[in-house]
Amino acid sequence: MGFLNTKKRIRIMLIIILILLILLLIRLAWIQLGQGKKYKEMAEKQQNLDREISAKRGIIYDRNGEILAMSASSEMITVNPNNIPKEKKEIVARKISEILEIDYEKILKKVTRNSSIEIIAKKVDKEKSNTLRQWMLENNIDQGINIDEDTKRYYPYSKLASQIIGFCGTDNQGLNGIEAKYDEELKGKKGSISKTTDAKGKNIGDTEEKYIGAIEGNNLELTIDKNIEQIVEKYLEEACIDNKCTDGGNIIIMNPKNGDILAMATYPNFNLNEPFKINNTELESIWDTMSSEDKNNNLQAMWRNKAIADTYEPGSTFKLVTASASLEEKITDTDKKGEFCCTGGIEVGGVRIKCWRYYRPHGSESLREALMNSCNPVFIGLGQKIGVEKYYSYLEKFGFLQKTGIDIPGEAGSIFLAKEKVGPVELATISFGQRFEVTPIQMATMLSTIANKGKYVKPRLVKAIINSQTEEKSEIEPEYKNQVISEETSEKVLNMMESVVSEGTGKNAKVEGYRIGGKTGTSEDGVNTGKYVTSFIGVAPIDDPQMVILVTLYNPTGEGGHQGGGVAAPVAGKIFAEVLPYLNIKKEEGENKAQVKVPDLTGKTIKEAEKILKENNLTIQLDEGETNKEKIITKQIPEKEITVYEETSIIVHTN
């Protein structure tokens, strides 16, 4: 009986062993046939020691082919700890530390690790790497230390357009600005150096290295003009320092015909070749004592592109939107005499909103005069006639209710009340540019729309992508959207803006020989902060606009005050004076004409005025439908004593 049980147990064990063998064979077959490729790749990876070769990042050019960012040759130092003899590890670590000026303990830790490869340093200057090569040669070290080609980003103009261009990290990845936005185009494809090693990562005999070259990244052509950017940055820095602008400033110059950003400056800027070095001397002195969070916050603020990332109340510059909508809706016209009357304020929803010149009201005004005087009550009244629904449709069409989509990271959106929450008082304040916030790029785009015969054009910073291998250029076409206002309305608004510069609050932006239009603005930076934002928005030449400019200065505290006409307009004037000739925009033929002072026509009849103007080689422009030559003139544009060219038309209004 016991014998039979033993035989039975043996039989069962044999069956189990047979089943296990069958399962093992099935498993081996599955590994060989189904997973063979995978394990082969894993084995090859384990036996091959790969070192990366950085791709040369694409060049960034300005619109005229000037290099703004490029990749200079440098080298990367790596070590293979398993290929460095134990007795030489300390010597190697000390010498590398000495040559590369890196902490000895950190290098020793890497050299003594049980690993096949360790990165010691990237972007090493040729001078240092050649010194290391020479030492290796003199000490017969032919393995364990690798010196491979690498690239280092270099910015020839240092601080120029720093917040636009951006910068790269240690792995050549774009971290900010255009470098980040177009990283996929610029970065190229990495190469590699491969060598077969044993299980411990040591070289096997004289096996040759396998080299796969890196592929360069594509190049970019920006819309920025280096020379215009330099002019703009020069005057922005001067303005911020002279006017003691505690929170800096920004300037945008845009071509209204195609959306090209010719210049976009933020002050203060920073050195692109040292992007992690703070640009503030006070902060620099306490930098080492600051927390990591505080350091990061200050660096983020330094890198911030105010022109697209900051919002502000535009103030009176926004009256251009109200004027455009009013003209487009046929609510008013530019020169209807006595259409409006400023009494120093206006009652809205039980609240009296004052004109800035409440102490000496403007009195009888046309729309042109109201814009020249920057009279709040007139624009409040126009806003009431337009109505919330229609006004918000214009905000939408002008692009204020969404981001512009400009091709750079970090763009902020505007801050408006929801349409349903806008009451009479809220509409009133919107009408003259307060109690909401927009970005500078939205404002520049708005004026570009007006200057582009009323058609919206999207702002852009990149004109073309150039293939680094074939040099084929892929142009990026301008993007046009809706017709916001008619060409007729566009001409009227531009014409009124010219009056603002020739005789109104924007006089300080005037440049002899050029027809320039503009609008000044001043607003509080927040509620009851005691801080102000001052701005000037302008366009030239009026008859064929080639450039739109927006100057925005944050909290000027200097002796010049904080009014847009006194602080921001002069900056625009200096820039117009240099940029317009640079763009080959010739001065008006009138520059060669004789100049005369406008005579005083007030108190005279139209008939008498015609005679006086004829004697001075000037002409007269009457109110529409005016035929009575005996009427007395009560107001004239330009005012008396203003210098103009012969044949200029003088606008007159009667009582």
Question: Where are the predicted features?
Answer:
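Beta-lactam-recognizing serine transpeptidase/beta-lactamase-like catalytic domain environment
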Residues: 67-69, 198-211, 257-317, 321-553
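Short secondary-structure junction motifs
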Residues: 142-144, 246-249, 335-337, 403, ...
